[in-house]
Swiss-Prot record:
It is an enzyme of class 1 (oxidoreductase). GO terms for molecular function: glyceryl-ether monooxygenase activity; iron ion binding. The gene is Agmo. InterPro entries: AGMP_C, Fatty_acid_hydroxylase, Sterol_desaturase/TMEM195. Residues 118-249 form the Fatty acid hydroxylase domain. PANTHER family: ALKYLGLYCEROL MONOOXYGENASE (PTHR21624:SF1), STEROL DESATURASE-RELATED PROTEIN (PTHR21624). This is Alkylglycerol monooxygenase. It comes from Rattus norvegicus. It is found in: Endoplasmic reticulum membrane.
Length: 447
């Protein structure tokens, strides 16, 4: 989306204000896409800071943290996975937009006009509303979007639980703008629209008074994430709630919201979170007789079945009682802290990889991606207490040391090199012993 140095032009103030769409047209006007900063990348430290702040504030106000460690790690893992394709190419939303602009535009609005800026703000938000609505009403698109709804908690980390597949359907809804709005203006607003939706994933903020009439707020979005019957298929807005009010999909928060999918998946494995509904569609597609019914499996709602309305029957949605207990890891507190530590190590190399894509070789980037994916998989296995978790973690630590020795992974602080080697050597020994125990007992063969 931008040249490697573009993000350095974003000040701390701009990085924070971008998260609330509080930017002036004059400070976000760029002639080319290459000049547009990566505002999402710049916001990463703010994400982490605000997640920690929310935990503290929730503890003070409610006497308990706003989320559970296992769920927060799973949400952040999804966020990491969703951005890995950006190491190789622009998002499909921007790439397709540029193609249509260069080949089919009918007119060219001035890139530095405030009127263009505000029109694009409305256009992107309108496009997002319809994408988001279709993501709930078309099963094959829901297969991607459901990952975002899989958390049974509702906090700022939930905003990071993004789908790696979502951009492959969302791009269609922004194409009309490419007929007249310059790509550089679109590239700014597609990021701001996403960033705005971060802070509304919280229970700490209850209501915002008159702003509730116009803006999408935490209260409105809590309804959207609910699995109560009154919450289903409501409040699709990105920034402005007016679209829901206009098109009849608005619902006010009026009773306790129970979060998550109507049928919780009960896992912390990041790739199962991402792809489990695709597997469900695959098996349902082949088990459903008739071409028309197979077509409907893909393009009608997730609740559709033969003889049912397009979006399914509301009475088939499980009733909530308010006594639902979220799926929680049975792992020890020590193991959860270990998972956090390993996630933090991975995150350092993840951020460093994005910051240095221009100088790293393709081989190094690919190997780092393998390490990142294996780390997230292993953390999911550990939290789910899978029998194979010890074996996977042993292999992961061995991979780290191998990549480290060959120079594909290096700590930012050179003096920590020896400490890294010692730490991962101890991990290999610990998990290696547990792996041998599992292999000897045969427990690793269990699902």
């Amino acid at each position: 989306m931008r040249n490697p140095g573009a993000q350095d032009n974003v000040s701390v103030s701009q990085g924070m204000r971008a998260m609330f769409y509080m930017m002036k047209p004059s400070e976000t006007a760029f002639q080319t896409v290459e000049e547009v900063p990566d505002y999402v990348k710049k916001a990463t430290p703010f994400f982490i800071f605000l997640i920690l702040l929310e935990l503290v504030v929730s503890w003070i106000l409610k006497g308990k943290p706003s989320g559970r460690l296992d769920d927060i790690l799973t949400s952040m893992s999804a966020g990491v996975v969703s951005r890995l394709p950006n190491l190789f190419f622009r998002s499909l939303e921007v790439t397709s937009y540029i193609y249509i602009w260069e080949n089919y535009r009918v007119c060219e609005l001035p890139w530095d006009s405030p009127w263009t800026w505000y029109l694009t703000f409305l256009g992107v938000d309108f496009g997002y509303y319809w994408f988001h609505r279709m993501a709930h009403e078309i099963n094959i698109i829901w297969a991607a979007h459901q990952a975002h709804h899989s958390s049974e908690d509702y906090n700022l980390s939930t905003a990071l639980r993004q789908s790696v597949l979502q951009q492959y359907s969302s791009w269609v809804f922004y194409c009309p703008l490419a007929l007249f709005v310059p790509p550089s203006v679109f590239a700014v607003h597609i990021q701001f629209n996403l960033l705005y939706q971060f802070w509304i994933h919280t229970e700490v903020i209850r209501t915002l008074g008159p702003l509730e009439l116009v803006l999408n707020t935490p209260s409105h979005h809590r309804v959207h994430h609910g699995r109560n019957r009154y919450c289903i298929d409501k409040n699709y807005a990105g920034t402005l709630i007016i679209w829901d009010r206009i098109f009849g999909t608005f619902e006010a928060e009026n009773e306790q919201v129970i979060y998550g999918l109507t049928h919780p998946i009960g896992t912390f494995e990041p790739f199962k979170v991402q792809f489990h509904h695709l597997l469900y569609i695959w098996t349902t597609f082949w088990a459903t007789p008739g071409f028309c019914h197979k077509f409907s499996v893909l393009f009608k709602g997730p609740g559709w079945g033969p003889g049912k309305p397009r979006l399914g029957l509301s009475e088939e949605i499980p009733e909530v009682t308010g006594q639902e207990v979220p799926f929680t890891s049975s792992a020890s507190q020590f193991l959860k802290i270990y998972a956090v530590l390993q996630f933090a190590v991975m995150l350092v190399f993840y951020e460093e990889t994005f910051a240095n894509t221009a100088v790293l070789s393709q081989v190094t980037i690919l190997l780092r991606i393998c390490f990142i994916i294996l780390t997230l998989t292993s953390i999911g296995f550990l939290l789910d207490q899978r029998p194979k978790a010890a074996i996977v973690e042993t292999l992961r630590c061995l991979l780290f040391l191998t990549l480290y020795r060959f120079g594909h992974l290096k700590p930012l602080i050179e003096s920590l090199s020896f400490a890294f080697e010692i730490f991962f050597s101890v991990c290999i020994a610990f998990w290696g012993v547990r792996s041998i125990t599992h292999l000897a007992s045969g427990s690793w063969k269990k699902p």
